[in-house]
Design a protein with these regions (language model features):
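A short, basic/aromatic helix-end/turn motif that makes direct DNA contacts
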Residues: 29-32, 56-61
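The DNA-recognition helices of helix-turn-helix-type DNA-binding domains
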Residues: 33, 44, 62, 71-74
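A short, Lys/Arg-rich alpha-helix, primarily the initiator
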Residues: 1-21, 66-69, 100
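Short, basic-rich loop-to-helix N-cap that marks the start of a DNA-contacting helix
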Residues: 44-57
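Short alpha-helical DNA-recognition segment
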Residues: 20-38
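Short, charged recognition helix plus adjacent turn
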Residues: 65-100
Length: 100
């Protein structure tokens, strides 16, 4: 799997730029600070549930799940990249019972 884009990058490239929205104007429309939106589009903060709601309301052809899924995919990829560096001993699991 490739490195999924940060949702802030998606927001900037597919929504804000094509609409000609500045960070200041978009932040005002979303009801958040310019700093908060700038941090999101620059990948310095994640899409929260509240932000996903705001984005879905601001861009009606999207939905809350889209924004949260974008964040989840981005997070999962980065976690997978770190997995080998984390040393953990697996627990022995009891055998699974089969039912017929």
């Amino acid at each position: 799997m490739h490195n999924p884009p940060h949702p802030g990058e998606v927001l900037l490239e597919l929504y804000l730029n094509p609409l000609g929205l500045t960070i200041t104007a978009a932040a005002a429309g979303l009801g958040i600070t310019r700093k908060a939106l700038s941090e999101l589009v620059n990948g310095h903060t994640n899409v929260s549930r509240d932000m996903a709601i705001r984005l879905a309301k601001a861009f009606p052809h999207t939905d809350i799940r889209l924004w949260l899924d974008l964040q989840s995919q981005h997070d999962a990829w980065h976690a997978e990249q770190r997995a080998e560096a984390i040393d953990v001993k697996p627990f022995a699991m009891p055998p699974m019972e089969t039912t017929v």
